[in-house]
Curated annotation (Swiss-Prot):
Gene transcribed to yield this protein: ndk
GO cellular component, as recorded: cytoplasm
Residues the entry annotates as binding ATP: K11, F59, R87, T93, R104, N114
InterPro entries per the UniProt record, alphabetical: NDK-like_dom (IPR034907), NDK-like_dom_sf (IPR036850), Nucleoside_diP_kinase (IPR001564), Nucleoside_diP_kinase_AS (IPR023005)
Record-given protein name: Nucleoside diphosphate kinase
Domain of life: Bacteria
Amino acid sequence: MSIEQTFSIIKPNAMKKNAIGDIVSMFEANGLKIAAAKITVLTTAKAEEFYAEHKARPFFGELVSFMTSGPVMLMCLQGEGAVLKNREIMGATDPKKANPGTVRAKFGDNVGENAVHGSDSPESAARELALFFEKHEICNV
């Protein structure tokens, strides 16, 4: 496997639980390094742009509302096979179905408020990273 970059969001519900340190420790313990990070509150426009693929879905409005409800932590994670590794660390989308010890099993509340987002492919990672970070903001760690 090669060194990759992937995009990750710690969502508002996990931020409210003060879970940043625990979640970042899980990434680092599994060989992922933080190449960029920022804490912000997403605007409605940015959340709608990020989740544009879900615009026609019935949950879109609720998703945008949740993602703009409080601070999020945006990260570029880097490491060997980072996209897949991050998805394994996160666990299943539904926290009830996530393996014990995964981020979503520990900090997710339900399918919508599942603590974290992670890119599902290298192509998605590139698109998502470009949406939130300038090239000069991402370090090669």
